[in-house]
Amino acid sequence: MAKQLLGKEVTAALNERIKANVAELQGKGVNPTLCIIRVGENPSDISYERGATKRCETLGVACEKILLPGDVTQDELLATIDKVNKDDHIHGVLLFRPLPKHLDQAVIENALAPEKDVDCMTDLSMSGVYTGKKIGFPPCTPQACMEILDHYGIDCTGKKAVVIGRSLVVGKPAAMMLVKKNATVTICHTRTVDMPSVAREADIVIVAAGRAGVVGAEYVKEGQTIIDVGINVNAEGKLCGDVDYAAVEPIVDAITPVPGGVGSVTTSVLVGHVVEAAMRKVNG
């Protein structure tokens, strides 16, 4: 039976560090503040907003919301972003995406000030992931994967790692973060030839394929660590990951469950980025 890499244990440790930093900031008269910008009434956005708001409250971080109609114009949204960019008491901004199709998402994303970009929305923030410079912040989900590896003492140095998925949101930044941990990394995608055999060669596999249960027993071997980023709803209406947990768990050494794995850490990473943004501002 594989060891379960439980997100709640990682979150508890991360939250303690965040609380200590919040106390330090408040001692200097600074109240770290997140601003959430939501366009329209997407249920998944509303759900994440609810979770982020609750986590902020728990950790002593202020959370403001700007709720805009689904038919908001490009100019109106850009003006909103410009306003929060100039608001000194707001340290981090989360804009829910994807945006409605009548909006130019790339232009809007890059209008945000990188120092307030707590979920790697801008091109400048993404460049920071690849250069190692503190420009903005890395995406919260791949950062949550790294927090899990760190918390459970899984050393990546010299290990073979496979990332399944090549999105800019998870796959590519996760691969770069693993490289920084001295792993030898392969990125797999829909055009990869014989993906199961490639995945079986790895010591660590991060799965961000975007399809429920796509990674089965043929992808894994004994001794592996599996990080499942996927969040899907199966035919029974239950949450499940991109990994076929029932098939994979008996084989591998360690695995994150869904739910209860990466997703539960991601929200604390977001709040931690807001606090770090405030600390960067205070410390210059």
Go through each PLM region and give its residues.
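Positively charged, low-complexity intrinsically disordered leader regions
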Residues: M1-V30
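Short beta-strand segments enriched in small/hydrophobic residues
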Residues: N31-G40
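Glycine-rich phosphate/diphosphate-binding loop of Rossmann-like nucleotide-binding domains
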Residues: V39-T53, S127, G136-T225, N234, ...
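Short beta-strand elements in bilobed, periplasmic/extracellular small-molecule ligand-binding domains
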Residues: C56-G70, V185-I187
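Short, well-structured alpha-helical segments in soluble
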Residues: E76-D88
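Anion-binding alpha/beta catalytic cores of soluble intermediary-metabolism enzymes, centered on
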Residues: G92-C156
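Short, well-ordered coil/turn residues at beta-beta hairpins
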Residues: F96, A208-A209, V229
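Rossmann-fold NAD(P)-binding glycine/threonine-rich loop
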Residues: A106-M126, G230-V282
